[in-house]
Amino acid sequence: MNTKRDFIDTNTYTQEEITYMINLGLKIKESIKNGYYPPLLKNKTLGMIFEQSSTRTRTSAEAAMTELGGHAQYLAPGQIQLGGHETIEDTSQVLGRILDIIGARVDRHKTVAEVGKYAKVPVVNFMSDYNHPTQELGDITTMVEHLPAGKKLSDCKIVFVGDATQVCVSTMFMTTKMGMDFVQFGPKGFQMKDDVVEIGKENAKKYGGSVTITEDADEAMKDADFVYTDVWYGLYDDEMPKEERMNIFYPKYQVNAELMAKASDHVKFMHCLPATRGEEVTDEVLDSDYSIVWDEAENRKTAMRAIFVYLLNPSLNYASKAVAEKYDAEFELMLKNAVDSRNN
């Protein structure tokens, strides 16, 4: 039976599965902080396809594999034939025969979807123009670590300030899946599309919580437990000049001390990073005591560990002692015969 599962869109996962991955990631994190690196990915190899530059995603994925006994290969743009001389289908089938798991950060979501369709091993979406699921899991893990006293996730409200980037969309997907109230505080023309919002509303209907889109700062920030923002000009924004975008977002949608003061007194600030200091967020907020961005960045690795172990767990069938001894003896004999033949 084919047990392959991809991590391309968290909407294909249940709340129970997400909760399991959060707990798995935190347990592995606890184990490593106490000095034990569980070999949960021993002898497993991750291939990483990057059509874009990356700091947090690449380093967290490589470190996650290494710490758990596996290995990661970086496949840079121009070094592999992905949709160039060779079709995505063919490249994916080849990589699926050589690697144990594939991660891909791509320009277009359909690319990672195709890799997932044709590769016979699990495929992880390291970010596309549609969503950023590994960021989602790291973020929700960080929220669990910083829950307000006496609250659970389903009691919390999160506000995403600014543009409806793929991180905004992903934040809505994940938080509504966990029963939270989600608000996008952003200008018209930069709000989430209706079909995307509908997914969040379906989650809210099933799990509780709500989805709100508003241009009213007071309405958005009232009783917020978490406030999140992203850059105003990102990897996929090339249709409007940067200066024009800045004029739309600044100063109303900048996360500063004045805006944060409208939230609850225990509010936490989040950012997927990299941040453009002085634009979408001030230094005062980013470096404040209520900023949890560095924990959030660290939990990218926590999330990667959980995702890789969860997806690869069905294939972790290690040989029995008897089988290992059988092959050790056969290899020893074959290598001895090879040496003898060279010496004759």
From Swiss-Prot:
The record marks K29, E145 as: Important for structural integrity. Pathway: Amine and polyamine biosynthesis; putrescine biosynthesis via agmatine pathway; putrescine from N-carbamoylputrescine (transferase route): step 1/1. GO terms for biological process: arginine biosynthetic process via ornithine; citrulline biosynthetic process; putrescine biosynthetic process from arginine via N-carbamoylputrescine. GO terms for cellular component: cytoplasm. Keywords: Cytoplasm, Polyamine biosynthesis, Transferase. It is an enzyme of class 2 (transferase). Carbamoyl phosphate binds at S54, T55, R56, T57, R58, R105, H132. Transmembrane segments: none annotated. Coiled coil: none annotated. One of its GO terms (molecular function) is ornithine carbamoyltransferase activity. Putrescine binds at H271, C272, L273, P274. It catalyses: carbamoyl phosphate + putrescine = N-carbamoylputrescine + phosphate + H(+). Its EC number is 2.1.3.6. It is found in: Cytoplasm. PANTHER family: ORNITHINE CARBAMOYLTRANSFERASE, MITOCHONDRIAL, ORNITHINE TRANSCARBAMYLASE, MITOCHONDRIAL. Belongs to the aspartate/ornithine carbamoyltransferase superfamily. PTCase family. Catalyzes the phosphorolysis of N-carbamoylputrescine to form carbamoyl phosphate and putrescine. Is involved in the degradation pathway of the polyamine agmatine. HAMAP family: PTCase (MF_02102). Homotrimer. This is Putrescine carbamoyltransferase. It comes from Pediococcus pentosaceus (strain ATCC 25745 / CCUG 21536 / LMG 10740 / 183-1w). The gene is ptcA.
